[in-house]
Each structure stands twice: as structure tokens, then as C-alpha cells.
């Protein structure tokens, strides 16, 4: 298989060239939570491939999944690299990616004053709530500050309950929100 975090440029080129055989015409290579060094290298690799050219499925940008996640709902994401959302750190990642981060999955309830949520929304990066312990009400607040999506609804988030609707309940209620399954 292929992992955006581990791949060298040639691996990425082979992946996008061959994935069209599976019917994929466009994609967002996705990173997962890792050390700053590993993430920076992965972002630079994708940016270099896009800049130098390739054949195959179109790379629309990068999906940056983590490291701004909730420990309880981290799933397979390595907890030693989970961080609080930081605009300054994200700017460094976006610079390494040559501006290609177009979609970010994060636990918006950990985003103090929704600073990173707002920054991303203002700079054309889709904010998606995922790997999150947010309540339904916190999701509504995140959407008021620019979040637009939920990453893999039902997985890595507060569940639906008749007394506490969680993120799953918010996904059903909010008409302007995109819920990815």
C-alpha cells in the first residue's frame, strides 16, 4: 500500500499514476498525525511532485488529518504527536506544502477561540471536525467560525445518544454541513 507520510516522491508518482486503474480521477493525499519532521517531509514531497509534474489522478491538494486531535477519539493516530491547534505551526506546515493543504481534520473544541478554524476558513482551507470529543453544541460553534465538514462520521467522534446528540447528531441536523462517511 501507499502512505503519504512515508512515501518518497517516486512512490507518490507511482500511486497517482496507478490509482486511475481503480477508477480514481482526483484525490487529496492524506497525512496522519506524526512528528513535525515527518509531516513536513511528507508535505514537501507532495508539493514537489505537484510542482514538477506527474501523470495520473489529479492531486487537488492535501488533506491534513491531525495532529490537532482529541486523545480519546484519536483512533490509530499516534498519541505522542497529538498537539493543540496552533495557527503559527499550521502556517509552517502550509509553507512546507506550498499552500497545498486544502482540507484539515481537527478537534475544533481544542482550538482556543477557534483561532485555527477561522484562519483556515479565511485562507481557503476546508475545516472538517474529526477525531473529536466535541458536543453537538460545540460543533455548531465551530461551524459558526468556519468549519464546514465532518470527517468519517460515526468514527472517531462523540456518538449519537438520545440525551446528548454528539457530533453524529450535529451531522444529521446541520443542513450546511458536509458529513463524510
Model-assigned labels for residue ranges:
Residues 39-41, 72-77, 116-117, 139, ...:
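Short acidic, glycine/serine/threonine-rich loops at helix termini
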Residues 95-181:
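Active-site core of metal-dependent hydrolases
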Residues 8-11, 42-45, 86-88, 163-168:
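Charged helix-capping and loop-helix junction motifs
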Residues 1-8:
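Di-metal (Zn2+ and/or Mg2+/Mn2+) metal-binding site signature of metallo-dependent hydrolases
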Residues 70-95:
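Conserved phosphate-binding/catalytic loop of the ribokinase/pfkB sugar-kinase fold
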Residues 5, 13-42, 57-70, 97-109, ...:
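Divalent metal-dependent hydrolysis catalytic cores, especially in the metallo-beta-lactamase
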Residues 7, 38-42, 77-85:
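Alpha-helix N-cap and loop-to-helix initiation/capping positions
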Amino acid at each position: 500500500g501507499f502512505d503519504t507520510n512515508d512515501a518518497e516522491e517516486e512512490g507518490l508518482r507511482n500511486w497517482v499514476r496507478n490509482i486511475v486503474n481503480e477508477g480514481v480521477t482526483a484525490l487529496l493525499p492524506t497525512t496522519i498525525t506524526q512528528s513535525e519532521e515527518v509531516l513536513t517531509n511528507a508535505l514537501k514531497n507532495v508539493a514537489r511532485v505537484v510542482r514538477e509534474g506527474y501523470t495520473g489522478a489529479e492531486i487537488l491538494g492535501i488533506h491534513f488529518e491531525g495532529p490537532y486531535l482529541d486523545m480519546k477519539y484519536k483512533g490509530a493516530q499516534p498519541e505522542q504527536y497529538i498537539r493543540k491547534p496552533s495557527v503559527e505551526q499550521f502556517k509552517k506546515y502550509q509553507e512546507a506544502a506550498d499552500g497545498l493543504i486544502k482540507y484539515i481534520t481537527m478537534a475544533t473544541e481544542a482550538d482556543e477561540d477557534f483561532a485555527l478554524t477561522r484562519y483556515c476558513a479565511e485562507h481557503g482551507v476546508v475545516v472538517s471536525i474529526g477525531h473529536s470529543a466535541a458536543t453537538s453544541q460545540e460543533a455548531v460553534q465551530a461551524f459558526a467560525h468556519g468549519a464546514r465538514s465532518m470527517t468519517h462520521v460515526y468514527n472517531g467522534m462523540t456518538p449519537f445518544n438520545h440525551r446528548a446528540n454528539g457530533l453524529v447528531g450535529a451531522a444529521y441536523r446541520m443542513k450546511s454541513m458536509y458529513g463524510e462517511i
